[in-house]
Amino acid sequence: MIKFFRKIRQKLLTEDKFSKYLIYAIGEIILVVIGILIALQINNWNESRKDFAKSKNYLSEIRKDLVGDTIAFNRSIKSISASIDVGEWALNRIHDNTSPIDSLWMSFDGTYWDTSVNDRTFQRVQNVGDSKFTGFESITDEINNYYGITKRRVEYKTSWDEKEVSENQSYMRDLEKYIEIDEYRMNMDGAGTLEKTFSIRQDSLEHVRMMIEFANSTRGRNHFKNNYVRHSRLLNIFKEVKETAAELIIKINKELEQME
């Protein structure tokens, strides 16, 4: 092909047909430019296909992370809801020696929840410098918001929850001055890891009576009320996060199905 055009150019020069040669030269330049543009366009298409394939894979992995988030937050929601129920029971129904000892100990719960948003895949995307999901721009902002705004809200609330628990644990020191820890409490704190437990030396009825007395004291009731507020606030945000993650999963599924 190059030889063919070269022969034409030489013939035009030999025949002293400069005007025709000039037109030919301009046409040749235009063809070269068009060829370069086509090559660049093909290269862009290839890069776009590669970026699309990567984005599709990233979305599939993010969907797995979101499913894990819904499971983790749902587990915490159930646990917090149970603690709220026990707290309500403690505020409304602790009044006599028939109160079960295990429910009494549960009502003094000092657990905090550190459930977090799993951003493993999103961080991998950020680390390679991808600021958007090629071919899936319609949900890019929602994904960025989930791993930005939503994640920070969860971190703030769980950090606050841990701080509240730490600052309000002094009541346990007061309680343990008079009430011996029983087998149930040891097993609860040990989370099933203890090989041995030890019986209490306090009279069982006296043991329960003292716990009820503390639970009905101003300090005890304030503890239950603080726990109720803490649990309720955390429950609300965990429900919001679970709902947001579930909605994002649906949107990702829809986008991936449309691209099949």
What residue ranges belong to the model's regions?
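Long, hydrophobic alpha-helical segments that serve as membrane-spanning/inserting helices
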Residues: 1-19, 23, 37, 44-260
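Hydrophobic membrane-insertion alpha-helices, especially the h-region
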Residues: 26-41
